[in-house]
Amino acid sequence: MQQQQFDQLTTAEKREVERQLHLYMDGAEEVIPPEELRAKLAKSILTGEPLKIKLGLDPSAPDVHLGHTVVLNKLRQFQENGHIVQLLIGDFTGKIGDPTGKSAARKQLTDEEVRRNAETYFQQFGKVLDQNKVELHYNSKWLKRLTLEDVIELAGKITVARLMERDDFEERIAMQKPISLHEFFYPLMQGYDSVVLDSDIELGGTDQHFNVLMGRHFQEKYGKEKQVVILMPLLEGLDGIEKMSKSKNNYIGIDEDPHEMFGKTMSLPDSLMKKYIHLATDLEAEEKKRLVKDLETGAVHPRDAKMLLGKTIVNMYHGSKAAEAAEQQFKKVFQQNSAPDNITAVHWQGGGTVPVTDLLVTLELLPSKSEARRMIQNGGVKINGAKAESIHADIALEHGMIIQVGKRKFVKLQMHQ
């Protein structure tokens, strides 16, 4: 049947199928299975019906960072080719919490937390997707209506052995850590979402392999055509080791200040440059290849490639003017050893002298005195451009004093009597 549909297409239509197939598979870690993706594209062109592309979101951590955009950029490719984007907010499943990669049970969210996080998600996604061309769904709409009889029927369509194939469940059993019964229902409900939405394709990161395959499993059990699964690579964070995550503080948020975004990009390990060029930018494919080749041959210095990468990323989320300003400020601060033009003013009542560690903590430049001492000992604190040498120093406060912590944090003291 799949080949018959493809054979019915004109030569131009077949070329269009292959163009889209190449586009969607480019950069993907895995497509399950590729031949079904080709067949779905052929059917879409033959019937004129767009495909329905699902992305499920667990609204437990609503701040969107570059790691999320790897999947979002792929979703945008489908959107730009006329297909339907189904953004599924797991407001019901979010109360359970996805156990993927967790060595312990997760805290359940309240209705208000889920709603607030979902709104934040959608607002930030507008920087990547056309919000006017997105179907927004909340799975509480159908999951809340399930009766106990429905739930038992759903549970009867999968075995415990199949659910135990999850690596995280196996690890928790081996470590003698508890698994609550309700956690087994997360993949069941995620799979059932695909049944209700009748999704043709589901996107996810490679860490979602088990969950997104549940959609195929349950669609087949309910007599529907199985969705294709497209898994995108995970983007390592600024530490170059762990997956990008706000909780690990190794992230670049798409809502961050342009200067901070640019500075963080410049701190990337050289080893991540190629991956970020491929997955985190909107550069044309040929430009990506050329830049990567120049890096490999030494035709371009990693620092200069990072400057282009930083400017490209800031431009994507804040526009060209902000990107240009961020680049110029970075050059001024780090290459010319000057303070930035726009320094945050902090207010101080009174005057006199203050221990340097107290000053840094009071101004919330560092979270604790121990952190302040460590930063001073590592040469990371400057007062009016001069390095703070002693953790026991008393600082004579003055109006307009510039305090620098680390490479990118500057404040200017505003004195009030």
Curated annotation (Swiss-Prot):
For this chain, one GO molecular function annotation is: tyrosine-tRNA ligase activity
For the keyword Protein biosynthesis, the answer is yes
Would you tell me the Gene Ontology cellular component terms? Answer: cytosol
Domain of life, per the record? Bacteria
First and last residue of the signal peptide: none
Where along the chain is ATP bound? 246
SMART domains hit by this protein: S4 (SM00363)
Spell out the family assignment given in the record's similarity comment: Belongs to the class-I aminoacyl-tRNA synthetase family. TyrS type 2 subfamily.
Q: What function does the entry list? A: Catalyzes the attachment of tyrosine to tRNA(Tyr) in a two-step reaction: tyrosine is first activated by ATP to form Tyr-AMP and then transferred to the acceptor end of tRNA(Tyr).
This chain's protein is named: Tyrosine--tRNA ligase 2
Q: Which organism is it from?
A: Bacillus licheniformis (strain ATCC 14580 / DSM 13 / JCM 2505 / CCUG 7422 / NBRC 12200 / NCIMB 9375 / NCTC 10341 / NRRL NRS-1264 / Gibson 46)
